[in-house]
Each structure stands twice: as C-alpha cells, then as structure tokens.
Amino acid sequence: MAKKTYKLRHIALSVPDVAVAQKFFEDAFGMTKAGNAQNGVHMTDGTMNIALLAKGGKAPGVPHEPFYGVMHFGLWVDDLAQAEKQVKAAGATHFGGRPPNTPNSYYEVKYRDPTGMVFDITASGWRGAVKNVKPAEE
C-alpha cells in the first residue's frame, strides 16, 4: 500500500486580541471570516483554515507544561512589493528577510502583526509547497 500524503489545511493560532487579529488578517491578507470558534474565529483564504483563538497565552494541556507550537506562518503572494505595502498599511512591522541571492534559499520577508505574531511573505514559495490548488467540492 502506498504511503498517503496529507495536506496541511488548518492552523490554530493563539492571539491576545481576536478582533485585532481578525481585522489584520482581513486587511493584510484579504482573508474572510469562515465562522466562529469557541474562543475566537475561523479565517480562510479559500484553501487554508486559520483559527484565531483567545487562549490568554496559556498552552494546551498541563498548566506549567512548556508550549511548543507554531513559530510563524508564511503566505505565498503574487507581487511582493504590493503585499509589503498592504501588510504595512494594515499595521505590520518589518523585522527581517533573507537576501534573494543567498544560495540554496528562497526569499522571504518577515513581519510582526499588530498582536506580535510573526509571519513571512514570499513570491517564490517554499520547497515542496504548491501555490494554487483546486478547492474541494462544496
């Protein structure tokens, strides 16, 4: 039997302020609200579901257990310059990037959203990632 390949289509992010995060995801990334969550909202770009959850900075599980989770997320854009203008206008702050001519690398630019969450944008993608996919039937 062939090994199945599973597709990542959902990420849950702990945010300090759901309303601020939701507005940023709408304004910066053009995402839309897909529904409510128990402690937040579900956003979508038409392919991915991203839950923005108010967890008060607490990790799941044991209260004093170290939390290991999402360090940042990335978005594949058509026009990097336009995307940079859009995320900055929505309140993002630039803090780094990988030079476009670094060998064995892809170019990405890192930002923090208004709640402090780290994300990057790229027009060249990531190894193994596919930019456009066919959505599931409704």
Language-model features: locations:
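N-terminal beta-strand motif that seeds the catalytic metal site of vicinal oxygen chelate
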Residues: 1-20, 49, 70-77, 124-138
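Amphipathic alpha-helical segments
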Residues: 17-32, 89
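Short secondary-structure junctions
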Residues: 30-36, 93-98
